[in-house]
Amino acid sequence: MGEIYIAHRNEYTNEVQTVREHCENTANLCKEYAIPEMEDLAYAAGKAHDIGKYQEGFQRRIRGENIRVEHSTCGAIAVGEKYPKPMNLMMQYCIAGHHTGIPNGGFGNDEDNSLKGRMNRTFEDYDAYKQELELPELDIRKWQQFLAADCGRNADWLIDKFTFLTRYLFSCLVDADSTDTAEFCRSTEVVRKLQADFEKCLEKINVQLQAFEVKTELQKTRSLLQEQAYRNSTKDAHIYLINMPTGSGKTLASAKIALQRAIAKKKKRIIYV
């Protein structure tokens, strides 16, 4: 039987989670959290994020030695070797920064904590990952088309979109990594957060709205405003603005519209700010 590469040790049960198990779990969660166009990229980032834990130094550290070992940059190097730019760059920022935050880009000969500076460092051999983890093939052309969509020939828009998607991928990766780590390392079984049932939520909203009396002129006006908002929300658009006065029921009306749109467009989540 080959060497066991440990990612985490549960201090309560003394059980170990292998690097392979953690990377595969993180990859699946990262894909689950991502929008459809980013799922494959998110999966690859999750698969590669802890490749550096295959270093001998990290394995000595996880087994009790009081030494410091940098591991996150190794995954960034690995995706840089596997995938072309700018796809690999997006993953590199996220993987290198998944413990400390997205680093500055830096320049070719840097020796600081920028992405370039960190990737210029020398690390122990971590090629053992190739025996346990297979980084997936990605559809480069499809991803490039998604990145360029809606940007036209405007370079600033393209840069802004790349920056936004990098931060989005970073959020997916950090959430996936911390969720899997927490679930393994806690003393009791963790109940995964529930997935909202938008159909049932909409039913409850409708029951509550139907329970309101519509007798006074104010109540009738409020009902008319809400119905107008519901009708207009069926028109196809990317952004909707609800301009209703205080006390007219914007909170419930906006919640109902969001649920209706989420169901109709098969969205996975609603973000309420």
PLM ranges: what are they?
Residues 235-260:
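Walker A/P-loop
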Residues 33, 232, 261-262:
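Hydrophobic helix-cap positions at the C-terminus of alpha-helices
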Residues 1-204:
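Accessory nucleic-acid engagement/destabilization modules that flank
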Residues 257-273:
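Conserved SF1/SF2 helicase motif Ia
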Residues 29, 228, 257-258:
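Short, hydrophobic/aromatic alpha-helical segments in well-folded domains
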Residues 18-23, 67-72, 218-225, 247-251:
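Phosphate/oxyanion-binding active-site loops and adjacent basic polyanion-contact surfaces
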Residues 41, 239-241, 269-271:
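Residue-level preference for the first positions of well-ordered beta-strands
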Residues 22, 208-243:
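Conserved pre-motif I regulatory segment
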